[in-house]
Regions:
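N-terminal Sec/SRP start-transfer signal
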Residues: 1-34, 43, 48
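C-terminal or late-domain output modules
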Residues: 4, 30, 36, 137-146, ...
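Hydrophobic, regular-secondary-structure patches
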Residues: 36-124, 274-284
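Short, charged, solvent-exposed linker or helix-capping segments at domain edges/interfaces
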Residues: 69-70, 135-140, 225, 243-248
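Hydrophobic secondary-structure segments that place a key small or acidic residue at a functional site
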Residues: 105-109, 116-131, 138-221, 225-228, ...
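Mechanotransmission and gating elements of multispan inner-membrane complexes involved in transport
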Residues: 190-195, 201-288
Length: 288
């Protein structure tokens, strides 16, 4: 009985002061939760907005990445090494596979481009996936391609099919050659020639306006690089960078076991890039 009376008095004595303390604690907790929600929401929205403007991770052959780092060459420089196209779907088997929004393999090649309106010699064109169905090592399937990674392009017409002799042409190149939707453009290399139907003319606002995009298989055949690619663009949903992710990006080996596990199991761009390198032999993945 005495114990119950003691407890009762401890709660009822100075009730006003205790109520004020409880109210203050509750208010502080509410403010902290609200601020945390705002911070996380802003980071997620910023990341989602940035991913609408193309890839945020680029995968290259290790040899090309080394040369690029040593001599600060442009990403558009002619490739000196290649990746196996059949290994690229492994990107969707990494720990953060569900954060991979889209990806596309590409292969650049120098070709002669001609049409009824003129011709251009030694033009660098890009072969890629547009909307390609892929079989994964897990037995699942996925669709990948640049159609969702070029959302800022203005397209007059439609995207090509991956299994057809078709292409989309940049607005500047289309103007030089007098091309429009439905016209035919011919790509020629020492390996042979390939007439392609123009399905659309796009405006990108950058150097892509001076070139064209064709199905990956077409450029592989014309350049003699069957089954090979020189770059993979990856669009991934990532967690905003912090000191841990920046430290890991320099060298994951310097992390402690606890930090390494935290970094690997968080969707930082650097950890996703690291996992892509684990999945694809001979590849280097970098955040862009």
């Amino acid at each position: 009985m005495f114990l119950l009376r003691l407890l009762y008095r401890s709660f009822t004595r100075q009730l006003r002061r205790r109520s004020l303390i409880a109210l203050t604690v509750a208010l502080c907790a509410s403010i902290c939760v609200a601020m945390l929600g705002i911070v996380l929401d802003v980071g997620d929205k910023l990341n989602a907005e940035l991913t609408t403007y193309g890839s945020n991770i680029v995968v290259q052959p290790k040899a090309d990445a080394v040369v690029s780092n040593l001599y600060e060459t442009d990403r558009d420089a002619a490739p000196t090494a290649h990746l196996d196209e059949s290994a690229i779907p492994k990107i969707k088997t990494i720990f953060w596979a569900y954060n991979i929004v889209d990806f596309a393999a590409t292969l650049k090649g120098s070709v002669k481009v001609s049409s009824s309106g003129g011709e251009v010699d030694d033009l660098s064109v890009t072969g890629t996936w547009f909307n390609k169905d892929l079989s994964l090592p897990t037995g699942e399937t996925t669709t990948a391609g640049v159609t969702t990674m070029r959302s800022w392009w203005t397209m007059e017409g439609s995207w090509p099919a991956d299994d057809a002799d078709q292409a989309v042409v940049g607005s500047n190149l289309a103007g030089r050659l007098g091309l429009s939707e439905g016209d035919t453009v011919t790509l020629t290399t020492p390996t042979g020639s390939r007439p392609l139907t123009v399905t659309g003319v796009y405006t990108s606002g950058d150097s892509d306006d001076d070139t064209l995009y064709a199905p990956l298989a077409v450029v592989q055949e014309l350049t003699g690089h069957i089954g090979q690619v020189d770059q993979v663009e990856v669009k991934a949903l990532t967690t905003p960078e912090n000191d841990l992710s920046r430290k890991a990006a320099q060298n994951p080996a310097i992390l402690s076991s606890a930090d390494w596990e935290t970094w690997y199991c968080t969707a930082y761009a650097s950890s996703i890039a690291y996992q892509i390198e684990e999945a694809i032999p001979g590849a280097v993945a970098k955040q862009v």
